[in-house]
């Protein structure tokens, strides 16, 4: 929580140096082989459940970005993002929910060249990642080894985003975008225990994640993107 508050304060401070402010919302798809295997093992080891536990693959993402003032085509900035995924399975006397949260603090390399490709831009985002995985059973926090079942993680992410500016009015833009991301390493040692009540059966303490996003960004700039 302290890290999140510190990141928010840093982001607010950085806004005083911003040339462009961006906020976006998107659909997010995630592929995590080890977490998928843990959920598949959960389903396989419980043949009595009629509704199988869905994989953690569909989610939403929201982010804020400040792009610093610069006359160069390649600009720099700060990005904060939050992602949420949910897996829910309702069975008789057993409603099982997995809630997965991600919080990223990243540094952006923002590039646009209106002389060659007017309206197009690309972002390279390098981020520190924190995660939290929680489980509820029948609307109550699930307990494992007499403790509330939860798993926290930390790692790093590299993302590439491409978008196109659409002018709404003077210095205000909307842009559709696509993003591809890769988290090569996220350390979350208790994730398997949260999902399947086992440790080391189908996954290690670390995990790799691939993501894709499709969404819209709202931009407010101090100068026109001409």
Sequence positions of predicted segments:
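Aromatic-acidic/polar surface patches that form glycan- and anion
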Residues: 53-57, 96-98, 151-153, 205-210
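Extracytoplasmic loops and strand-loop junctions of Gram-negative outer membrane beta-barrel proteins
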Residues: 43-49, 90, 141-148, 195-200
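Sec-dependent N-terminal signal peptides
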Residues: 3-14
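Short, charged, low-hydrophobicity "junction" segments
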Residues: 7, 98-104, 193-195
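Structural signature of outer-membrane beta-barrel domains
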Residues: 28-34, 83-89, 127-133, 181-187, ...
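Predominantly the C-terminal beta-signal and adjacent terminal strand-loop region
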Residues: 36-38, 163-226
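Gram-negative (and chloroplast) outer-membrane scaffold detector with strong preference
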Residues: 63-144, 148-161, 166-172, 218
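Short glycine/proline- and aromatic-enriched beta-strand/turn motifs that initiate or cap beta-hairpins
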Residues: 18-78, 217-226
